[in-house]
């Protein structure tokens, strides 16, 4: 025992004397620029280390006293005494420059920015760190805040009485108050590589109009810079190249800005990034890397301005954390954006905080499916106490005042007294409502809502047969489970022909989650013979007929992505050749003659089945939000007319197939296509109402190219199987932005081609190509495209190609993030 104790004591003393300490720091020149490849020696001449490309060094020595020598051939040697006793030491050294003379010429070593080399090392380790995001579950808190700041009004320089001036100041202060919108979301986010996500929202609070708020769900975008491209449809149409992309060194300029230490004592490298060319779809800003490990510690990046759809400026900040087991997790995100609206400005931010991580979590086999997000039944009913407890980031003063004010207003507005007063005001009959706005009536306790047509719209001069006196009203009942019923009546009296017409429509949403809708319609009104006619032909008398009809319609999602639409209709169709017409319409159209056909009756059923495989969606309480799919949508439509039912004499069957898709093509933009093929399987008896028309092009107007041809010379009917195809590619500036200074104009280019094969028209093969440029235009917060296109079409039946310029107009749908 004594011998063992002696050995243990000896080892303890030996281990204490053999204790090592770390010496680290930076070596720079007199301008504080880092010096790489500095040799470091100690007193006995032993070399203990070198500086890296950023001037950083690190080595270990036993406890004791040393003279450390820093040596570089182009700088003066520096020696420092170091005593290592109880802790590590840090030495930051400046080496004076050593000028070498050759005759009267001084030669000094040129400094090379280490930023590109640092990024090269980060790119080399990209795949490794991309694999270090483990399957995990985390609690995520999201707060989105936005305010509209109206333009400041000019002060009145004229003197006014104190009372009037005070009242005006109060009114001005009230008018100048910012319009604020805000949302808070608490959710559990489950993640499994390489990109599977499932959210469960346990708390949702929305105040004001939240349609313009960004990133209310982590499903809205993946800001993973370990991917080559970052695509966020809510921000812009084009993807942006990641600074860690394999070709980033060709597209980005990197500059080393310095370094700092984080709370864990790690050295963080700050690198500035900017585009090498203004035409590149790349970020600008800063990326912070952890030295030697070269994973992303923090980013602060600006989205390229020319790629923004809705915003004028968009900045994203992210912070990451490395666990003890070398697993990467995202810690927080912040998105700041600004957008002009009129003479005012919208500004907002979204804060996303991740905590309570469970790393390497094992999920059930079918946990990650097509439902990527869902909300609990109580998520939208959380009170202030819940949010006070769950907020991971305190509110600022503006947010506190806003929430306090809105909570107080909500308490008042949810009181029976207030609701009764609002209801009474809406139900009050006034001259302005009767003639201009439209009279309302509601009974909120029973869920009744009624709208009556304003009297200023009673006289309508645009109907076939001349001016008509119209009256329409709407009755609606809404239920708490999102179901509703609606009744719409529309009556009219023709002054010229002294006829009464009208329609009654009943609709109900019987299954909100599966978008189940039932509709029943009955009436006697006008309808289009060819509802897809060219714009100039749509309003001609030859495109109208009288329709006395009754029909029922049901549409519902059967399984996810599979929709069935069934319609049954009985109708009597008459032409309008015996009508008395106004001369005003004759001045608008030449040869404005009604189409004549025999009065007929039709009883038919219409069946449409469409399927989008692997359709992703979000589940709201009693509601479903479709996110889309990477797969095409396949559709089949059968229209079958049955003779002999209640005197019906129309007899035909028409079958049509469709396939359509919209898909991205990286930095080249995105493409979309639509292919349609149809034919009459039986056509024993048809009227012009039942024909399948091929639409002619509109002069000077660029018609939506997925549904129409631009240069087809005439409208005609097809009975046999036809095939039409439409393709369009949106370059979204990827070509035109390469021209100097064009990027500032925010132009978007696109091109496409259409084809039609109609065998019964002497084996007609028609094809056309088009291309053009659109200018992005903003009106308030809405975005539009106004452009000019050039189209060239040719057919084996044409003597020469048909060419022409077209004007294009498109609107950006903020709800679906699409044009």
Region annotations inferred by a language model:
Residues 83-110:
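Extracellular beta-sheet/turn segments enriched in Thr/Pro/Gly and aliphatic residues
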Residues 104-268, 274-282, 343-344, 348-460, ...:
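Structured extracytoplasmic
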Residues 67-81:
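A short, solvent-exposed loop/turn motif at the edges and junctions
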Residues 239-240, 369-819:
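Exposed, low-structure sequence patches enriched in small/polar residues
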Residues 38-42, 68, 107, 138, ...:
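Hydrophobic beta-strand segments
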Residues 21-29, 55, 93, 107:
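A short, amphipathic beta-strand motif
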Residues 45-56:
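Short, acidic Ser/Thr/Gly-rich low-complexity loop/linker segments typical of extracellular
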Residues 21-23, 29-44, 63:
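Short, ordered, surface-exposed loop/turn motifs in non-cytosolic proteins
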């Amino acid at each position: 025992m004594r011998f063992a104790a002696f050995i243990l004591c000896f080892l303890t003393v030996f281990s204490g004397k053999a204790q090592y300490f770390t010496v680290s720091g930076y070596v720079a020149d007199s301008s504080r620029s880092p010096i790489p490849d500095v040799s470091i020696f100690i007193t006995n001449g032993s070399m203990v280390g070198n500086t890296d490309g950023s001037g950083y060094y690190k080595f270990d020595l036993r406890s004791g006293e040393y003279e450390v020598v820093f040596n570089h051939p182009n700088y003066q040697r520096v020696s420092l005494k170091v005593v290592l006793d109880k802790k590590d030491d840090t030495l930051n050294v400046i080496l004076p420059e050593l000028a070498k003379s050759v005759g009267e010429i001084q030669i000094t070593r040129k400094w090379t920015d280490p930023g590109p080399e640092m990024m090269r090392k980060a790119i080399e380790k990209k795949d490794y760190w991309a694999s270090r995001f483990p399957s995990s579950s985390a609690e995520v808190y999201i707060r989105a805040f936005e305010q509209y700041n109206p333009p400041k009004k000019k002060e009145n320089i004229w003197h006014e009485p104190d009372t009037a001036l005070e009242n005006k100041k109060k009114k001005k202060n009230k008018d100048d108050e910012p319009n604020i919108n805000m949302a808070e979301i608490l959710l559990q986010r489950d993640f499994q590589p390489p990109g599977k996500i499932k959210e469960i929202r346990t708390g949702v609070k929305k105040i004001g109009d939240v349609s313009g708020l960004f990133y209310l769900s982590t499903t809205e975008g993946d800001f993973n810079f370990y991917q080559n491209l970052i695509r966020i449809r809510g921000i812009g149409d084009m993807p942006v190249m990641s600074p860690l992309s394999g070709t980033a060194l060709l597209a980005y300029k990197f500059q080393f800005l310095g370094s700092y230490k984080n709370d864990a004592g790690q050295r963080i490298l700050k690198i500035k990034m900017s585009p090498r060319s203004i035409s590149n779809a790349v970020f600008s800003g800063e990326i912070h890397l952890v030295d030697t490990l070269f994973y992303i510690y923090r980013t602060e990046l600006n989205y390229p301005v020319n790629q923004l759809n809705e915003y004028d400026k968009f900045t994203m900040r992210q912070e990451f954390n490395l666990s003890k087991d070398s697993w990467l997790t995202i810690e927080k995100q912040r998105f700041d954006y600004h957008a002009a609206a009129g003479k005012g400005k919208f500004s907002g931010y979204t804060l996303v905080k991740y905590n309570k991580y469970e790393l390497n979590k094992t999920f059930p086999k079918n946990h990650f499916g097509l439902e990527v997000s869902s909300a609990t039944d109580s998520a939208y009913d959380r009170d202030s106490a819940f949010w006070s407890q769950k907020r991971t980031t305190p509110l600022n003063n503006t947010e506190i005042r806003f929430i306090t004010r809105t909570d107080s207003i909500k308490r008042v507005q949810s009181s029976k007294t207030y609701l009764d007063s609002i209801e009474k005001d809406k139900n009050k009959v006034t001259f302005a409502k009767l003639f201009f706005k439209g009279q309302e009536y509601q009974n909120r306790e029973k869920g009744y809502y009624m709208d009556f047509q304003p009297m200023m719209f009673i006289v309508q001069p645009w109907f076939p047969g001349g001016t008509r006196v119209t009256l329409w009203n709407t009755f609606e009942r809404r239920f708490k489970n999102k179901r509703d019923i609606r009744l719409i009546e529309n009556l009219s009296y023709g002054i010229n022909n002294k006829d009464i017409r009208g329609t009654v429509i009943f609709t109900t949403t019987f299954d909100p989650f599966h978008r189940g809708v039932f509709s029943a319609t009955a009436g006697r009104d006008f309808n289009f013979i060819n509802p897809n006619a060219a714009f100039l032909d749509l309003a001609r008398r030859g495109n109208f007929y009288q329709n006395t009809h009754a029909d029922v319609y049901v549409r519902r999602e059967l399984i996810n992505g599979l929709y069935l639409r069934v319609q049954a209709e009985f109708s009597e169709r008459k032409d309008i050749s015996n009508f008395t017409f106004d001369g005003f319409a004759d001045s608008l159209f030449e040869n404005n003659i009604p189409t004549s056909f025999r009065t007929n009756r039709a009883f038919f059923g219409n069946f449409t089945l469409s399927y989008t495989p692997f359709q992703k969606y979000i589940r709201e309480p009693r509601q479903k939000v479709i996110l889309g799919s990477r797969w095409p949508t396949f559709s089949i439509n059968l229209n079958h007319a049955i003779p002999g039912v209640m005197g019906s004499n129309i007899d035909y069957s028409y079958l049509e197939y469709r396939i359509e898709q919209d898909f991205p093509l990286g930095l080249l933009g995105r493409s979309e296509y639509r292919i349609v093929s149809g034919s009459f399987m039986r056509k024993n008896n048809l009227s012009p109402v039942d024909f399948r028309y091929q639409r002619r092009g509109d002069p000077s107007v660029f018609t939506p190219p997925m549904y129409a041809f631009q240069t087809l010379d005439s409208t005609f009917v097809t009975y046999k199987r036809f095939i039409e195809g439409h393709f369009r590619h949106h370059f979204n500036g990827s070509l035109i932005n390469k021209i100097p200074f064009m990027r500032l104009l925010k132009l978007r280019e696109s091109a496409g081609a259409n084809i039609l094969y109609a065998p019964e028209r002497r084996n007609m093969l028609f094809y056309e190509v088009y291309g053009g440029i659109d200018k992005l235009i903003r009106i308030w917060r809405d975005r539009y495209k106004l452009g000019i296109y050039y189209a060239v079409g040719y057919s084996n039946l044409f003597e020469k190609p048909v060419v022409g310029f077209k004007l294009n107009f498109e609107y950006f749908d903020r709800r679906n993030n699409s044009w």
